[in-house]
Structure formats: structure tokens, C-alpha cells
């Protein structure tokens, strides 16, 4: 039993935290300037193809949609939380992605995302099919 506790503590300290139950994650409101639509620009090493697009939708209340598209759309709802003082997106599949913002640029899952006016049509369709629990950001003009 002591070994399990020690290993668990080491994983948390090493930044390898794991979420056992998505519903137990405490949602954090989006910090100022993070609410909105974010999208990859150009090829990203973390995506399967140079034509693939990664998008992140963040509501003011901290709900998210991680939307990646290439030959199909994979859209995972999630929520923002603080893990070890780092702002992190936790998806319903319990995947953890740290978020770092610098102006209109995000570092997210090893990718660089830029602020955009609205989601891609494919991600907008995913949002219509499975809406987030809180209101979406207002699209930019």
C-alpha cells in the first residue's frame, strides 16, 4: 500500500498527473483573453498531415472543445482546470493538455494555435451536434 502511495505521489510531482473520473474535475473559468476560437496555422508536427487542422473552443465558464480534422472530425468536449498551478484542458477521454497563452497565440499539445474569428464549418457542425454546457464565445467580426 505504501508503494502505491509513493508511486502516485511521484507521478503527480513529475507532472504525470492522471484524471480518474472526468466528472470529478473542478472546472476553472477561462482567464481573461483565453475565451474564444483558436486554430492551428500551417503544418504542425503533432498532426497526422500537413493538411490537418487543430481547433480549440474555450467558453468564458471554462468549457472546451478540442476539434481536430483531416479526413474526419474528432471533437472532444472538455473543461479547463488547474493542475499543479498550470492551466490544463481535460477532455472527456481524460487526456490532459497544458495551455500557455502569449497574446493571440496558444501553445497546446505541442502545437501553436492562433486566435480566429470563428470555428471551421466542420467544428461548428460538431458543436451543433454536441453543444457545450455553457454559451459559446461571440464570433469576432
From Swiss-Prot:
Keywords of the record: Cell membrane, Lipoprotein, Membrane, Palmitate, Signal
One Pfam short name: YedD
Organism domain of life: Bacteria
Signal sequence annotation: 1-15
Covalently lipidated residues, kind S-diacylglycerol cysteine: 16
InterPro entries referenced in this protein's UniProt entry, alphabetically: YedD, YedD-like_sf
Lipid attachment site numbers (N-palmitoyl cysteine): 16
This protein's GO CC annotations: plasma membrane
Subcellular compartments: Cell membrane
Topology term for the membrane: Lipid-anchor
Predominant location: membrane
Protein name in UniProt: Uncharacterized lipoprotein YedD
Organism: Salmonella typhimurium (strain LT2 / SGSC1412 / ATCC 700720)
Gene: yedD
